[in-house]
Amino acid sequence: MATTETYTLNDFVGDLDRITREETSATRVTERVAPLLAQLVRNPRSIPAEYLRSPAGQRGRYILHRAPKFNVTSVVWRPGDRATAHNHETWGVIGVVENEIEETRYRVTETGAGRAKLEVASVTRHPTGAVSRLVPGDEVHGMYNPTSRDTIEIHVYGRDLAGLKRRRWDDDGTEKPLVSDKYLNC
């Protein structure tokens, strides 16, 4: 059994592969993955250093592992970076490697004509080591780095978000299409 100091990205990917073969429920997958991601983010040395920084002028977004049933990415949020309310179309688990991030969860009620009522369900400031779970039906959130330093996270999703058609909402509830950019390293 790997300890926190020895639990590596390769260990994590192996565990994810096993879990996603054993489980079909998004809730069960995220319940089992969350403590493992918490262990991984406590050992940032296991993530290649080039995937833990943002390029000048943009958010860092790197693929660490791509598999048929899951993807592992690193995301580097610059100070002040914000993602408005958006969905994922899959389960997800997010862990903070360094610094902190503010996550706002929303309940969305479609009102028609490309609009929705967004109700804030919770606002949580996640410190280093914290893990957040997303499951369909409870996977609309916004993210914000309120600090003066980069925030580094590991994101795990049940689908590849690059090119996936999703939705985002402005603060006034206007719905807009969202297609995630490609990763910076592929």
What are these regions (language model features)?
Residues 135-154:
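Ligand-binding loop in jelly-roll beta-barrel domains
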Residues 76-78, 87-103, 156-159:
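Short, conserved beta-strand element in jelly-roll/cupin
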Residues 50-79, 131:
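A short glycine-rich, His/Asp/Glu-containing loop-to-beta-strand
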